[in-house]
A protein has these predicted regions:
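Right-hand nucleic-acid polymerase module
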Residues: 1-76, 86-136, 140, 145-149, ...
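Catalytic palm active-site di-aspartate
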Residues: 139-143, 191, 195, 217-234
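Short small/polar-residue motifs
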Residues: 70-73, 216-220
Length: 378
């Protein structure tokens, strides 16, 4: 199972599998039912590569949420230079089970229309598109988002409508999806496959309230994980305004999250307005530095060759950190990073955009040369 968990699942799951998941969900009453459901989901994700989860493995996974060996911790850089985000990644067997469970949750639950993250056919671009051409864009960030969602909160949600799960089944799912956090509380780990989907489940009530609040003030509202955006033509965002007071009351007093004041910003039309990293002043765009970074990476590769470009990339772009619990350093290949950046550029600007097409042509030529070199070496 460990080897299978490292391999990527299929990009698309057959409709027959999702239909089967919905049917089994309607008959979910016992741990045995849950095991069958997870295995059906894993078959849908991995096909012939799937390894069935045994009852013993499910029990071991479910009843060891306080075991520190279930997760290993590493850091990834934030956009702000010198700052890092801590990721708690599950060990392979736990990750494998969580992947199956995540497909189940995504199949049986439809997130609120304002939730743009971790939902099929929604993205940072669809979220940003809502706020195009507005006079004002107001962004806020929820502090320590994943660790604010406790196991008790998840259990309560799973035993309530629309899930209405048996208490024992809800408890097993909660144990699989939560871990003992830095302060000893059982919370959502940032790094588990199930965590993003669960945040949308937990935030549904808040999304409903904030959508209603936005409508009352003639605003548009969207949320991508912990990033919340309002936009509109009227400035109702004064520090002591009725809107801001209502907003804080909903988020902090009623829903138990905390607004991060350091990441709260109001952008006027004359400024660069961004929603989850996408510029929305007139049309969706990426920041200039993003394209500049791509051009620099491609230029270094074209002028100095792949190996020297890789060395420069590791020196200037790859943070000096390792995964302490596993002893394995993260692997960063410049060609993979460029490919990912180009995919994002394509998603935001479109495949017919001249900037994207020019950069993609340069990358394709470099990749052809790299493949030819590899063939000659063989």
């Amino acid at each position: 199972m460990n080897r299978t968990a490292i391999l990527p699942p299929k990009k698309a799951v057959d409709t027959a599998v999702t239909t089967r998941i919905c049917d089994l969900w309607g008959c979910l009453h016992t741990k045995k039912d849950l095991l069958k459901l997870v295995n059906v989901a894993l078959e849908g994700l991995y096909g012939e590569r799937a390894c069935s989860v045994s009852m013993a493995q499910l029990n071991k996974t479910a009843y060891s949420s306080h075991n520190p060996d279930r997760y290993y911790t590493f850091k990834i850089p934030k956009k702000k230079k010198g700052e890092f985000r801590t990721i708690d990644a599950p060990e392979p067997t736990l990750k494998y089970i969580q992947q199956g469970l995540n497909l189940v949750l995504q199949t049986v639950y439809t997130p609120h229309s304002a939730a743009m993250g971790f939902v099929p056919r929604r993205s940072v671009v669809t979220g940003a598109r809502m706020h195009l051409g507005q006079r004002l864009v107001y962004n806020i960030d929820l502090k320590d988002f994943f660790h604010t969602i406790t196991s008790g909160r998840l259990y309560s949600r799973l035993t309530s409508k629309p899930f209405c799960l048996d208490g024992k089944v809800a408890g097993i799912i909660t144990d699989i999806c939560c871990y003992s956090g830095p302060d000893g509380r059982n919370v959502l780990p940032m790094g588990a496959p199930t965590s993003p989907t669960i945040t949308n489940i937990i935030c549904e009530r808040m999304d409903t309230k904030l959508t209603r609040l936005a409508k009352a003030y003639g605003l548009k509202y969207s949320r991508y994980a912990d990033d919340i955006t309002f936009s509109g033509m009227a400035n109702v965002f004064g520090e002591d305004s009725r809107f801001i007071k209502s907003l804080r009351n909903i988020i902090e007093r009623e829903e138990g999250f905390t607004i991060n004041p350091d990441k709260t910003r109001l952008c006027h039309r004359g400024m660069r307005q961004e929603v989850t990293g996408v510029t929305v002043n007139e049309k969706e765009n990426v920041p200039r530095w993003y394209v500049g970074q791509l051009r620099t990476m491609l230029h270094n590769w074209e002028m100095d060759g792949h190996d020297k470009a890789q060395a420069v990339f590791e020196c200037h772009y790859v943070p000096k950190f390792t995964r302490p619990s596993s002893g394995l350093p993260p692997i960063h290949h410049i060609e993979n990073v460029i490919a990912g950046k180009l995919l994002y550029l394509k998603m935001v600007k479109g495949e017919t955009d001249t900037t994207y097409k020019a950069l993609n042509r340069r990358f394709a030529a470099l990749m052809d040369s790299l493949k030819k070199r590899a063939t000659l070496i063989k």
